[in-house]
Amino acid sequence: GKRVLLISQDGHVGGLTASGLGATDINQREAIGGLSREFYQRVYDYYSRSEVWTNPEGWEYYSRQLGKYFWRGKNDSLRMQWMFEPHVAEKIFQDMLLEAGVEVVFGERLDLQVGVEKKGNRIVRIRMENGRVYEGHMYIDATYEGDLMALAGVSYTVGREANALYGET
C-alpha cells in the first residue's frame, strides 16, 4: 500500500548492471534471493527465447565466448542467468518497476546547495536543481555519489575503514 517515487538524475535505471556490467561473477548461486533472484530469472527467461539471438548458435556461441569466465553464465535448474546485455537488464528493470507501480522521474538532479530540508534528524523534503520539490516519509539514496546522504548530514566513510573498527583481520 505504499507509493514509491524513483528519481533518476539521468535517463536510465539499473545502475552499473544496465550501464555495461553485463555479467555477474558470483559462484554462490544459492545465496541469491529476492529481487536479485527475480532479475536473474527474468534474464534467463529472456535468453531462453530463440528469437532474441542474432547468432544461430545462440547460447552455445555466447557460452564459448564468455561463459568460461563466469561459471558458465547460467544455471538451468535454478532458471537463472548471469550474463546479459545492458539493454536487456534495463528493460527488465523498467518492467519490474512498472509492474510494482513505481513512478519514475528522469533527468532530475538534487540541488547541492539547498536540496535537503530536515526537521530534527528526519528529511522532510528535497529540492531539485530545477526547483521542483518532493516530499516523502522515507528517502533512500541509491546513487553512486551519495549526495542526498551527505547533504542530510549522515555520517559515512570514504574508502575502506580500518580492520580494527569491526574486528576484521
Regions found by a protein language model. Give the residues of each.
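Conserved N-terminal/central alpha/beta ligand/cofactor-binding core
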Residues: R3, S8-G115, T157, Y166-G167
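Voltage-sensor-like transmembrane helices and their cytoplasmic interface
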Residues: S8, F39, M138, Y144-D147
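Short, hydrophobic/aromatic-rich segments at coil-to-beta transitions
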Residues: G120-I126
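Glycine-rich loop(s) and the adjacent beta-strand/alpha-helix scaffold that form part
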Residues: D141-T169
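Core beta-strand elements of the Rossmann-like FAD/NAD(P) dinucleotide-binding domain
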Residues: E129-M138
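Nucleotide donor/acceptor-binding cores
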Residues: K2-R3, H137
